[in-house]
Amino acid sequence: MPCREIFLLWILVPIASSSDHITFFGRYACNVDFKTDYCTPDTYVGRAFYYGLEDGGGITTNGTFVNSDITVEFFDPTVQGNFSIGRQDGNYMSSMLDIMLADTKKNDGLLGVVGVENDCKEIAALAQAYDASSLLVNCEDQVGESQMPSSTALQMSSTQGGKYRAFAKLAKSVGWNNLAVINFVEDGPADISYHDQLLDALSAESISLDFVKKGGFSSTITSAMFTGLESVIDVILETYMKTRIYVIVLDLPVSGTFFMNAMSTMGLLETGKYFVVMMSSIESDAANYFGFNVNRGNMIFKTIDYGISDADIRQYYRSFMYFTDVPHYTKDFSDEWTSFQKRVDGDASKTFCPPMCNTKAKGIANNDPWSDDAYWYSESPSIVDAYDLGRLLSETVKVHGASLLRDPESLVQTMSGRGVTSLLGYVTKFNTNGVSQREYILWAPQQASSSNGPIPLPEWATLAARMLPDGKGNYSIIWKNLTQLGIFNGELPQSKPECGFNNELCPAGIRNLSELEIIVIAVCVVAILILVGVIAYIARWIAYERRLESSYFLVHRKHVQLVDMTKFGSSRGGSMIQSAMSMRSQYEDSGPVGGATMNFYTNGIRKAAIRRNQMQRSDKGPAANRDEWLEIVDWHLAKYENTLVTVRKINKTQLKLTREMKQEIDLLMNETHENLNRFFGLINESDLIFTIHSYGPRKSLMDLLRNDDLRLDRMFKVSFVEDVVKGLQFLHEGSKIGYHGNLKSSNCIVDAYWRIKLSNYGMEQIRVEEPESKPDDLLWFAPEIIRRYAVKHDLSKLELAKADIYSLAIVLYEIYGRQGPFGDDLLDSDEIIEQLKFPDGGALTRPDIHLITKAPYPLASVVEKCWVEDPASRPSIKKVRELLKPLSKGLKGNIADNIMNLLDRYRNNLEDVIKERTEQLEDERKRNESLLLQLLPKSVANSLKNGQPVDAEFYDSVSIYFSDIVGFTALSSKSTPLQVVNMLNNLYTNFDTIIDKFDCYKVETIGDAYMFVSGLPEVNSYLHAGEVASASLELLDSIKTFTVSHCPDEKLRLRIGNHTGPVVTGVVGIRMPRYCLFGDTVIIANMMESSGEPMRIQISSDAYELILKCGGYVTEQREKIVLKNKLEVMTYWMNDYSKDARLARLVAHQEKFPHLEHLIHKFNKGVR
């Protein structure tokens, strides 16, 4: 064993005297260790054990175990015996035999051995032979194991075998079923045993060992070289196609560094597919491995001398974890740990010498087990184990008695199965065989904050997993989120590829491609896709050019048949729609307009046949001649390809189509949207230039808005707004056209389904040099367009789109104002256009916004935002649509959708109509029942509904409330009848709300008199007296804050009387039946009110008796009074009550009277 091992042995022996003793066998003096003058860690172990005995509460301040005569003695073999400082093998046994023989001569019995590190097997057997227990602190042999059983041994420390079994379970849990084990430790008896234990543990978990190598690396480490590198590379070459997970066992950590360096040299650490898990061949190893020595020494981080940079180390650790039982070092684990350090490290006290006989020597840097020095830090767990063992022993003796020390097997069995969380934070539990099962930890690198600079020590590591023992050989594994670690891809690799290293695990024909093959295939696929894309683009471009050259959009005039419109009462050059309605019946079924019905849906086939015949007859003559086309002023109705269309004239003498014009027309031909009017083509024959658009049978939006006989409800207006906005949004955002350019209500065509379709959009290049429009046509244009009208074709699409937003505002203004684009403005169009061009004194000319201020929110504000002078400040069409969303709140679909839904409902969903009517009938029935229940009790109402007679009913005990408003007559004389009614309505509404919180039934109100009762029609035992009393107090409180609306200075005062007694109830009359109470109780209750005083509650003696039974009420006896019948009675004043007492009554009677449950619910909700 290395020289750092703890030299400590305690023997627990009863001394032959008046009281038994426990002899503490171990070093407590410092000045003889290695012929120096400072304390070493094994001295701290003794102190820690003694403090554990103290803290466990099992010994007294003088060192005697509680409730016994067993005391603690101390024996230091280096001072009091012949123990050799060299501590060769056999020294522990020799000293122990000497003590045992001496005890035998003194006729003392051995109780136990504590703190053995060497010769564990032999000492445990010797202790068992002497019928003594052995409590082992730092023994690497597992004495309780089957190969060296001892029924009197309890082992505190962890062992290599335990660590290997824990690691095997961890590997199994993450699916590492194939491993390579590389053991750098050269052969020795203990090393061979540990190696075999590792292999056995892995085999027990059914983990295949694809490669195992023990020693034989012939490696030496100097300041400049690692001579075993070639043998390491040979191992990797032999194994990397067998496994991806390497388990490295080593005694010199830098060996692992060079192993990973070799893997990196071979390119195995670049993708995260290979992984290394390292373990030390000795226990208490984390400090040695992680390099807590402040000078780094020859730890794994000391790599610069071996030619490995910090940057390389950072890369290595991305495929690395370390498995250990020792917690990660930190200077302050907890306040408890810091306190423990100071306590064990404190000055000696001669009162407790031994064992606290020497102070800590000063000025010695490397003798501190609490320091960063890895050599001494490794002793900290031993010190803590000694403390925990002393505490457990003391606690056990405290609970089970000191006599347990005399029965070694019982002592061990009692302590087995117990667990402890140490001061360092790790968990230890004892198995049933007495061997500790220690918590194990898997450490991993942190995510690097930077890729440069030295690796921080020791903060580089972070906890990846904790294995918490259960005392039965199993563990609960708690993983940290792997994505927060510094390992590759934030995940652990598999021990084998999915298809195996040679594709042996995949079916024939399926195999894993190499990275080079994947790259080549990917490049080829990308190249093919690019080539296909280029070819497709070229083909599309050629087709596009051919399409433009073919002028496919040109329509010959002979294919368009003008329709004679004179017989429909309209001139050819007039409004497009004036004649549309008259010809609709001959050429198109336009849906429900004016007084039309819906029967065209049922006989559409017959009508369509008639229309086709009529159209064929009208087209038999020769094609319209040139003169007819020249007579067209603006537009004309025509037929093209058996479809009604409108031909609109372009006022030019000739039109030479340029490439830009063809591109513009091509866009018009290919744009389709439900809110765009279809463009059929262009007629370009000398001076006859016309565009062809689809015909709108329901007139334009302008014509609908100017038709005073046509009433447009909210649904129509909102639908029109949505259609215009959606069409404009498509032009701005979904079309290559990018703008409308001529938005006005006359260019908003209405189709057969009342859907708006934008027409006459685009074509700015075609309209170049066209004469300026008339002033009336310019009222929709934005001011910047009017000022630059002659060159507006040179404006960008963005500028024209911003101008569309202004035009949209005018159209919205028209829809809700219905008085034209500028409302009822008295100026004529020429003046308006002039002011738009040149604002007078900077004042802007806009339509009168007050005309649409009553329009639904937020139309007016949106209109104002859209027609601002600065185009850049106008919202986009997307923003406009978002702002107008509240306009359609509560409406579903558009006009056509609603019409079709209406038809479907009446034609196909008659059952829904019946169901709706049935539900309405049921709702009406419920309302009638509710009204009836407000007039009569539920039982009475049910009898009346069922046509049954309502018999009078006797109640032996109820409580009745009467109240009257003092001074009501005087107040009424100063008020109008309406004011009196309003006042009483407000007052009694308040009263009704209050008594609803109590188990009371309102009987009636007569003028200013208010009457209710409790105890009927729902019986509630004696609770009715309390319910009426509580409600009376609540009403009295409420009247104090009641305000008479027409006389705020007047305060109403109540006079209240309560009485308890029997009554008879019944329904009186047939017409307007009333639920009435009869009997002396009613009369006396009224007398209690009339003989009372303002703002007080007078109760009878009968009511008082039940009030006392209820409990929780404050009453005051009043002098006897004489009632109207000359009867002298004792009465009481009711002053206050306890709400909690009432709740307790209700809860106590809830089971017997279920109707009280809703009152409890209201009470708990705060409705008191």
From Swiss-Prot:
Guanylate cyclase domain residues: 959-1089
Coiled-coil ranges (or none): 896-934
Binding site for Mg(2+) 1: D964, D1008
Class of the enzyme per the UniProt entry, highest EC level: lyase
Transmembrane segments: 518-538
Tissue occurrence: Expressed in pharyngeal muscle.
Gene3D superfamilies on file: 3.40.50.2300, Nucleotide cyclase, Transferase(Phosphotransferase) domain 1
Swiss-Prot/TrEMBL catalytic activity: GTP = 3',5'-cyclic GMP + diphosphate
InterPro entries tied to this protein: A/G_cyclase, Cyclic_nucleotide_synthase, Kinase-like_dom_sf, Nucleotide_cyclase, Peripla_BP_I, Prot_kinase_dom, Ser-Thr/Tyr_kinase_cat_dom
Subcellular location: Cell membrane
Enzyme nomenclature, EC number: 4.6.1.2
A GO BP entry: cGMP biosynthetic process
Keywords carried by this UniProt record: Cell membrane, cGMP biosynthesis, Coiled coil, Glycoprotein, GTP-binding, Lyase, Magnesium, Membrane, Metal-binding, Nucleotide-binding, Receptor, Signal, Transmembrane, Transmembrane helix
Function comment: Guanylate cyclase involved in the production of the second messenger cGMP.
Family to which the UniProt record says this protein belongs: Belongs to the adenylyl cyclase class-4/guanylyl cyclase family.
Protein name per its UniProtKB record: Receptor-type guanylate cyclase gcy-11
Organism per entry: Caenorhabditis elegans
Gene: gcy-11
